[in-house]
């Protein structure tokens, strides 16, 4: 259950990172944060990759690790305002919502699912 929650949270976090320009989201990012779930929380480290899949949309894939395991998620995000993205991610049978906000060379990601939430800070 922690694995599914962690993956969902990570994917959502990645999806909600805003960028000044859509093209700047493309590429590899890495960082850390906290995954919260019923009964506790874990520190998490992630590597996230964004690739363009349309005029404005980006595919998202992430590989994250906690003390209890490694998790992978995939999804898609689209612009939802200035330096903001929104999308859905999936992993370990769980789907989550992601909001990404960009401030310079840093992405702030929030992920939420029925199993928990996550907050991440990513950089290039």
Report each predicted region and the residues it spans:
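Positively charged n-region of N-terminal signal peptides that target proteins for export
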Residues: 1-4
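C-terminal segment of classical bacterial N-terminal signal peptides
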Residues: 12-20
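Central antiparallel beta-sheet cores of small beta-barrel/beta-sandwich binding domains
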Residues: 23-124
